[in-house]
Amino acid sequence: CSDHEVNLKTMLFDEVRSGRITVEQRNQVLTEIQQDVCEHVLMNNREQGLLLSLDEIRSEVDPFSIERTMMILEDRGVLDREAESLPTQEELTTRHVDGIGLFRPELAIVAAHAKMDVYQRLLLQPVGRVDELRFLREYFPAAIRSRFADAIEKHQLGREIAMTVLTNRIVDRAGSFFFLDM
């Protein structure tokens, strides 16, 4: 079960609980949008795969950016390089001489921690500074947006979902090393 399904079911549960739809209607909606949800999850997976591919190239070309990224994340208490079995500065230098950057599993660890750091920092922003509703709406399939617009706006995890969408959009496109000076 993906986070998309959980967040959708949470919203629909609130609709059932309030009496706006029945359990049968909820189940019908879930059946109708199953393919859309799967496609959305797969799109996110593709974007994360692209992030890792681009970060792999970036880490080969500029190992010092990845080193700086890991140091910043460590300084912020977000990353424990030793616990995550990530290379030391010396190991990165040796790899760079050999034309090697971080390996994809290592990049996935750095990307996850970078995303969590960006996400936490976005949550600290005052409400209204970011167009949260736009990102929240984009998270849900079109059929849900048109039928349950009010429920989306009232989603109990609306801000968190919106900041997750924004975090993924930024980091997946700009890379794990991009947003660390914020």
Residue ranges and their predicted role:
Residues 1-182:
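Ligand/cofactor-recognition surfaces for anionic moieties
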